[in-house]
């Protein structure tokens, strides 16, 4: 007996506690008293920071500047007590709700589950009631598997992988033997025939798709939360046509208007600014792929799998000089391009430099550019209440924004280079009795000789040329690119190779899954068999 009505009740009633043991398989009875919890809010596994909200697609500081993260060491905790705390019971990350008798509900606690007739499967099709059905013979020994993998910011992405002869379907679309597809919340899973719906998949870590505008849902599948801030959040998403990952920045119009007096400041015209930023095209600048203006703003950005430069520096304590050179060369190219197009970033910091991969040698991209255009004068003054570690001296001593020019970005680049080479910030209120503002405005940075002993004189010289208090005497991006430290042909060749690899990967067409021609077991109904012929696999969601 079909129990799809129970699932509809589950979808409409929201989250409730589940009484079944974690990771258990429970026989489905078609009762509304069964566990019906659906997560109504995102529970990202990303590490939180008390200093800054950020994401792998960039921080939210293009629309609000948050307090800058600090690099100083955290004091060690006191010695733990002798008694070790009990291990917490793992919470399920997903739930499969059975739609037919003979199948059982499943709460997913482990990272991998096989489904099929084989006894080795974690979810074995061995119920006597199921074995008596005609469809049982069409199921494979290992029909499909559901698993999750670590994605951006240590969040997880759920996938379904087809290993059957007669097909596994997600929302009536064939996955294709040997192919995988991201599995999003409320997806319906059918076996052998697209109409033979067996499970509904509930991702307990993400929001329901229905809360997003239809125009957005038509093109993208929304997934995990990657970062959040006072005015919005950043979500991982998948393009429906290609299944490629993207990052979608969501800005709350209501919170943004309240927080920045938007109506009183015409500079806060997000729509106009987005149109300008969409025209920017540089390999070292995050590309805006799409924009949706609904109840909130939705900005679709390319996803950077390597995360933030800040995390890279913290994780490694400091970067190799060769790595610093490769990254900094790209930063200079990006900022030079912005300046040539009349844009001053004014919020350059390691959190706004994203890495294309976890590899040591990789492309970087500047994000949250256009800060100076999106934020008005009043809002910018509020950002100075935070820790201005990367702000140029002229910003701290000026009243309002008058007098700012592109030199402020070059100062920030100098601070970033200092941090990458040494592993600590040049200016910090935690290391001296001198106020942070006085340190910056006097240009007296914290120089530790034993740390810098491993850094070349050329690299240190470039840092000094950028951290000049007088903006007129400070190095420009053009001068920095001509500096002897960056006249490294091997480094430039490596950058070009990485660029070529990226261009090749983005140019390759998406290989769509094709149906299997295997007919080891009978397929029910010849007419139904035609459903799986030459059907391209696409990302899909129940909307």
Swiss-Prot record:
Residues 113-175 form the FHA domain. Changing residue 167 to R: In prostate cancer; somatic mutation. GO terms for cellular component: cytoplasm; Golgi apparatus; nucleoplasm; nucleus; PML body. Its main location: nucleus. One of its GO terms (biological process) is regulation of signal transduction by p53 class mediator. This is Serine/threonine-protein kinase Chk2. Residues 23-62 have a biased composition (Low complexity). It comes from Homo sapiens (Human). It is an enzyme of class 2 (transferase). Serine/threonine-protein kinase which is required for checkpoint-mediated cell cycle arrest, activation of DNA repair and apoptosis in response to the presence of DNA double-strand breaks. May also negatively regulate cell cycle progression during unperturbed cell cycles. Following activation, phosphorylates numerous effectors preferentially at the consensus sequence [L-X-R-X-X-S/T]. Regulates cell cycle checkpoint arrest through phosphorylation of CDC25A, CDC25B and CDC25C, inhibiting their activity. (Microbial infection) Phosphorylates herpes simplex virus 1/HHV-1 protein ICP0 and thus activates its SUMO-targeted ubiquitin ligase activity. Residues 220-486 form the Protein kinase domain. Changing residue 68 to A: Loss of activation and phosphorylation. Changing residue 181 to C: In prostate cancer; somatic mutation. Residues 8-22, 506-517 have a biased composition (Polar residues). Activated through phosphorylation at Thr-68 by ATM in response to DNA double-strand breaks. Activation is modulated by several mediators including MDC1 and TP53BP1. Induces homodimerization with exchange of the T-loop/activation segment between protomers and transphosphorylation of the protomers. The autophosphorylated kinase dimer is fully active. Negatively regulated by PPM1D through dephosphorylation of Thr-68.
């Amino acid at each position: 007996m079909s129990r799809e009505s129970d699932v509809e009740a589950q979808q409409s009633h929201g989250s409730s506690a589940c009484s079944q043991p974690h990771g258990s398989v429970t026989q489905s009875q078609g009762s509304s008293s069964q566990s019906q919890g659906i997560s109504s809010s995102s529970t990202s596994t990303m590490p939180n920071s008390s200093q800054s909200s950020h994401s792998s697609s960039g921080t939210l500081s293009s629309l609000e500047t948050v307090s800058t993260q600090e690099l100083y060491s955290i004091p060690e905790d006191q010695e733990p007590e002798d008694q070790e705390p009990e291990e917490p019971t793992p919470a399920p990350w997903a739930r499969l709700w059975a739609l037919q008798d003979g199948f059982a509900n499943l709460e997913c606690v482990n990272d991998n589950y096989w489904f099929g007739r084989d006894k080795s499967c974690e979810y074995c099709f061995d119920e006597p009631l199921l074995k008596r059905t005609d469809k049982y013979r069409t199921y494979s020994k290992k029909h499909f598997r559901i698993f999750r993998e670590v994605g951006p910011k240590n969040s997880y992405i759920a996938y379904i992988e087809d290993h059957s002869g007669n097909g596994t379907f997600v929302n009536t679309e064939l996955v294709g033997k040997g192919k995988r597809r991201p599995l999003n919340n409320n997806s319906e899973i059918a076996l052998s025939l697209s109409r033979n719906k067996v499970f509904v998949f509930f991702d307990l870590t993400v929001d329901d798709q229905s809360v997003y505008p239809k125009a957005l849902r038509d093109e993208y599948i929304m997934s995990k939360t990657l970062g959040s801030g006072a005015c919005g959040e950043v979500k991982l998403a998948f393009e429906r046509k290609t299944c490629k990952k993207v990052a979608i920045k969501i800005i709350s119009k209501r919170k943004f208007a309240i927080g920045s007096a938007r109506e009183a400041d015409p500079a806060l015209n997000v729509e106009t600014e987005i149109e300008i930023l969409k025209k920017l095209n540089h390999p070292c600048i995050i590309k805006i792929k799409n924009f949706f203006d609904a109840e909130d703003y939705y900005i679709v950005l390319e996803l950077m799998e390597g995360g933030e430069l800040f995390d890279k520096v913290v994780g490694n304590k400091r970067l190799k000089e060769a790595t610093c050179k490769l990254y900094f060369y790209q930063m200079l190219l990006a900022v030079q391009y912005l300046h040539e197009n009349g844009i001053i970033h004014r919020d350059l910091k390691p959190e706004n430099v994203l890495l294309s991969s976890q590899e040591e040698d990789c492309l970087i991209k500047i994000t949250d550019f256009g800060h100076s255009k999106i934020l008005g004068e009043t809002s910018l003054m509020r950002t100075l209440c935070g820790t201005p570690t990367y702000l140029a001296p002229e910003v701290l001593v000026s009243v309002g924004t008058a007098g700012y020019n592109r030199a402020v970005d070059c100062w920030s680049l100098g601070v970033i280079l200092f941090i990458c080479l040494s592993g600590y910030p040049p200016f910090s209120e935690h290391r001296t009795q001198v106020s942070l503002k006085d340190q910056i405005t006097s240009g007296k940075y914290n120089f530790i000789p034993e740390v810098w002993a491993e850094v070349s004189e050329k690299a240190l010289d470039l840092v000094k040329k950028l951290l000049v208090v007088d903006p007129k005497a400070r190095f420009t991006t053009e001068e920095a690119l001509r500096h002897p430290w960056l006249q490294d042909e091997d480094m430039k060749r490596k950058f070009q190779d990485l660029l070529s690899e990226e261009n090749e990967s983005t140019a390759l067409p998406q290989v769509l899954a094709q149906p299997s021609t295997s007919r080891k077991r009978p397929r029910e109904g010849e007419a139904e068999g035609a459903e799986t012929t030459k059907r391209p696999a696409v990302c899909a969601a129940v909307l």
